[in-house]
């Protein structure tokens, strides 16, 4: 008994000591998290020009920037060295010039800052400056991520309060002057009140009561208006119940009663359509005083005709329609939106709201990017780890319960870094989409961008091995444990980013996932007809053209210097892949991703799925469309035009692929709206894509865009027709989510510019020239009717400003209101806006706002604050100023 008492006393004493230790460590974490004020100041984006050894540090393209990271301790003194700050940096940190601290990269964008032996503590009120050298440049505020946190052994990690905010401007300074330039030769026009005013000067308010978005193929305007104050009598039997409900939902938004008085006749008569009108989605419609008559090629055409009725309605005064007749058909069969819910999750409600708007503007393909390195977002029955582990990001260094934090998500799961669609959620999305004539295309990205899957299946492997179930543990394992390949992916992950394409277990995994997803589609009554393989960026960036070997005899100044002998191609050190190379199944390691795509296409075809889709670089080593087992093989083409895309897109079409134009420099909606550091987004392909630029994109004549736009540095480029090829299959607008951390940010980035993508996908404009081999375009070619382009955009912009933005607001969409242009001349304020019809306001003190009228320009002095305001007055743009 005495022995037991002594043991018990010893245990209690030990536990008390542990509790005391844990408490002191937690106190340090809490103190630093609550009291450290962290600020970033950009010092230069031209490191090499400022004497920094970018090349010797191994910076890609020998390009680096310098930033001061300043830490101010606003709390009590901290003497402990046993702590670390984890912070997110999309740029690799190459050097920290402070002997008291060291920085290491954990994985992806997650970096670790910790004290060295020379650390002498944080005194109360002390300011510590850490000069950081990072790769490339940092030109926009959203290059800097929130979500830094403090950790210590035996303590719960805690978010640093000063970086627990979406107000990035509160901790970033220095983005001005030359620091706005990517290089000293950057010729972009930076957005300010005056430059916006000059850009908008060719726009004018005009009557657009008979103008419809997207523009129909043929419109004949009548005289007068048709009274619909008492609603329209839409025949309910023309649609199934779910589609009629979808139509009713849109009718409520625009303020039209579909069970009213004005007769509407709808018939589906495909035999009556010939030539360019004989295709799915086509319709003819007549709107007259005695009723509306619709004749459709198919059910999709009937649905779109009704959407055209709603499109002509002014939701702020929904009592009339213009008399007119329409003959209409879509330009492309594929009119898509891609939404990345993997990097950061977006809610089911946000997806449903997107489907509503897609239907209203006649878009018909929702491509869901469901998986990536940073997250797996779809429940798969039988593989619970995919969502238990792969759908969550938190601070677990072993990644047994979650993925490590990325992209500003911090140490906890209570944000959009975590989340997934349950099976029921996904089935609901499918049903909702089907009712709106939209096909949902699921993308499970592989073999690259697959870290969430790989880590999840390793967690599954470990669980089952602990249970003694070795065969079951290996059933769906995705990495070769003997693979020692040293690789760095585009977003700075190691070999865990890749599904090993040489293992039978990988093929079983793909088969399992496709089967489960197909079953969900079947349950929803929307059979799976297209499987998106992903396939992009299966490479080691260190073997790219931006690096040279440390021992190279003829080094160039514009490449980073590294030891290339330590770098591998993906899978090069995998014994299982080496076997495939040795036995001649695959010619070399570079061909493995395309080989894997071909193998997956066989699984897809065996399951009766007719269409196989991928990002084009994933298929680059395949021998054309005939190498795939499915009826159709489609590629999202995403080469940048000024890097050769004006020509290479036609190569893919010539190989027999159905090309879906998806160019990042024109239809990526994660790029900033303006060349302004306040705007959100990545900008590797273009410094900005606003609604006007997207509207002016010529998707079938790629060289033409060289005359109407510039490269990412604001310089001209050339494009020449070189290859004869079949017509393209479609157009897709993409929203990648690295910088998009919540639904509000998501809708801001997508709307309203996605309406310009809808316009280009449905309608070919007169100013779009035919593609011709031998014709070259540039800033000086003068082959494009730019007057016609500008007039066309003016109409489009007026429809947005006068009608469509109000509909977005009534739909609850957090769209972006344009920042006004303004100038002061002779003491008078002049203002304009990208979408005529949007209300403008100004203020002399930043608090009291007055409505601007161009016919009564006000006299002003000093700094004048400006903004635009929505139709309800409840939503305002970003506020800027002019002097």
From Swiss-Prot:
Give me any GO biological process, just one.
chitin catabolic process
Q: Name one Pfam family in it.
A: CHB_HEX_C
Instruction: Classify the source by domain of life.
Output: Bacteria
**Triggers of expression:** By chitobiose.
Q: GO CC terms for this protein? A: cell outer membrane
Q: Does Ligase appear among the keywords?
A: no
Predominant cellular place of this UniProt entry's protein: membrane
Top enzyme class, one word, equals hydrolase
PROSITE patterns per UniProt = PROKAR_LIPOPROTEIN (PS51257)
Q: Signal peptide location in the record?
A: 1-17
Q: Which residues are connected by disulfide bridges in this protein?
A: 54-64, 394-402, 502-577
One molecular function GO term is:
beta-N-acetylhexosaminidase activity
Q: Which UniProt keywords apply?
A: Carbohydrate metabolism, Cell outer membrane, Chitin degradation, Disulfide bond, Glycosidase, Hydrolase, Lipoprotein, Membrane, Palmitate, Polysaccharide degradation, Signal
* Database matches in PANTHER family: BETA-HEXOSAMINIDASE, BETA-N-ACETYLHEXOSAMINIDASE
Protein family membership: Belongs to the glycosyl hydrolase 20 family.
The protein here is known as N,N'-diacetylchitobiase
Per the UniProt record, the source organism is: Vibrio harveyi
């Amino acid at each position: 008994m005495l022995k037991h008492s002594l043991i018990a006393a010893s245990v209690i004493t030990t536990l008390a000591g542990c509790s005391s230790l844990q408490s002191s460590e937690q106190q340090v974490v809490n103190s630093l998290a609550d009291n450290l004020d962290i600020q970033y100041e950009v010092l230069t984006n031209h490191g090499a020009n400022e004497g920094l050894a970018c090349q010797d540090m191994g910076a890609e393209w020998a390009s680096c920037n310098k930033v001061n990271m300043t830490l101010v301790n606003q709390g009590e003194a901290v003497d402990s060295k046993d702590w670390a700050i984890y912070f997110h940096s999309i740029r690799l940190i190459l050097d920290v010039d402070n002997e008291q601290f060291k920085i290491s990269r954990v994985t992806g964008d997650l970096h670790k800052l910790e004290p060295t032996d020379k650390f002498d503590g944080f005194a109360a009120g002390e300011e510590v400056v850490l000069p950081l050298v990072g790769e490339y440049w940092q030109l926009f505020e959203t290059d800097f991520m929130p979500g830094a946190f403090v950790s210590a052994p035996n303590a719960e990690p805690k978010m640093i309060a000063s970086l627990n905010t979406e107000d990035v401007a509160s901790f970033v300074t220095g983005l001005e002057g030359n620091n706005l330039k990517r290089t000293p030769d950057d010729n972009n026009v930076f957005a300010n009140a005056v430059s916006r005013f000059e850009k908008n000067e060719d726009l004018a308010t005009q009557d657009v009561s008979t103008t419809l978005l997207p523009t129909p193929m043929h419109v004949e305007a009548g005289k007068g208006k048709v009274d619909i104050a008492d609603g329209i009598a839409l025949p309910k039997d023309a649609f199934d119940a779910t589609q009629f409900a979808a139509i009713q939902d849109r009718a409520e938004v625009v303020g039209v009663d579909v069970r009213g008085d004005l007769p509407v006749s709808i018939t589906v008569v495909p035999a009556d359509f010939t030539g360019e009108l004989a295709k799915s989605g086509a319709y003819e419609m007549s709107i007259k005083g005695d009723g509306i008559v619709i004749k459709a090629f198919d059910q999709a055409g009937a649905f779109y005709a009704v959407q055209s009725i709603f499109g002509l309605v002014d939701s702020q005064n929904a009592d009339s329609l213009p008399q007119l007749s329409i003959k209409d058909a879509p330009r492309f069969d594929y009119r898509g939106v891609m939404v990345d819910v993997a990097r950061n999750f977006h809610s089911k409600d946000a997806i449903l709201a997107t489907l509503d708007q897609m239907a209203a503007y006649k878009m018909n393909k929702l491509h869901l990017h469901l998986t990536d390195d940073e997250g797996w977002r779809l429940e798969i029955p039988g593989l619970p780890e995919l969502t238990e582990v792969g759908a969550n990001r938190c601070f677990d260094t072993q990644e047994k319960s979650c993925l490590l934090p990325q992209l500003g998500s911090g140490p906890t799961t209570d944000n959009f870094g975590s989340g997934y669609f349950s099976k029921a959620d996904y089935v609901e999305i499918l049903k909702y989409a089907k009712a709106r004539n939209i096909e949902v295309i699921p993308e499970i990205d592989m073999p690259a961008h697959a870290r969430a899957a790989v880590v999840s299946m390793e967690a599954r492997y470990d669980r089952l091995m602990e249970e003694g179930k070795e065969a079951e543990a290996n059933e769906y394992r995705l990495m070769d444990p003997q693979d020692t390949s040293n690789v760095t992916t585009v977003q700075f992950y190691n070999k865990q980013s890749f599904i090993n394409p040489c293992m039978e277990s990988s093929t079983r995994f793909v088969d399992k996932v496709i089967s489960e997803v197909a079953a969900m589609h079947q349950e929803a009554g929307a059979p799976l007809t297209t499987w998106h393989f992903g396939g992009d960026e299966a490479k080691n960036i260190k073997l790219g053209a931006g690096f040279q070997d440390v021992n190279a005899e003829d080094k160039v100044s514009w490449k980073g210097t590294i030891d290339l002998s330590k770098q591998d191609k993906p899978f090069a050190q995998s014994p299982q892949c080496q076997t495939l190379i040795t036995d001649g199944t695959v010619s070399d390691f570079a061909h493995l991703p395309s080989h894997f795509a071909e193998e997956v296409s066989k699984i897809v075809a065996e399951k009766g799925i007719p269409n196989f889709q991928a990002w084009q670089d994933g298929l680059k080593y395949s021998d054309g469309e005939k190498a795939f087992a499915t009826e159709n093989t489609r590629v999202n083409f995403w080469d940048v035009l000024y890097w050769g895309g004006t020509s290479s897109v036609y190569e893919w079409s010539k190989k027999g692929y159905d090309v879906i134009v998806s160019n990042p420099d024109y239809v990526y909606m994660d790029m900033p709206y303006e060349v302004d550091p306040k705007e959100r987004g990545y900008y590797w392909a273009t410094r900005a894509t606003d609604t006007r630029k997207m509207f002016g994109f010529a998707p079938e004549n790629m060289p033409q865009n060289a005359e109407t736009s510039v490269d990412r540095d604001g310089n001209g480029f050339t494009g020449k027709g070189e290859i004869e090829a079949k017509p393209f299959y479609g157009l897709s607008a993409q929203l990648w989510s690295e910088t998009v951390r919540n639904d509000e940010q998501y809708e801001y980035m997508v709307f309203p510019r996605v309406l310009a993508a809808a316009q280009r996908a449905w309608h070919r404009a007169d100013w779009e020239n035919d593609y011709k081999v031998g014709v070259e375009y540039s800033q000086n070619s003068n082959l494009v009717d730019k007057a016609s382009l500008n007039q066309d955009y003016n109409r489009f912009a007026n429809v947005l400003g006068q009608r469509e933005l109000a509909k977005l607001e009534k739909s609850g969409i957090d769209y972006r209101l344009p920042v006004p242009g303004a100038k002061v001349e002779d003491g008078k304020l002049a203002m304009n806006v990208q979408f005529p019809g949007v209300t403008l306001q100004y203020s002399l003190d930043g608090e009291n706002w007055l409505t601007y009228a161009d016919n009564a320009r006000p006299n002003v002095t000093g700094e004048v604050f400006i903004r635009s305001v929505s139709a309800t007055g409840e939503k305002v743009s970003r506020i800027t100023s002019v002097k």
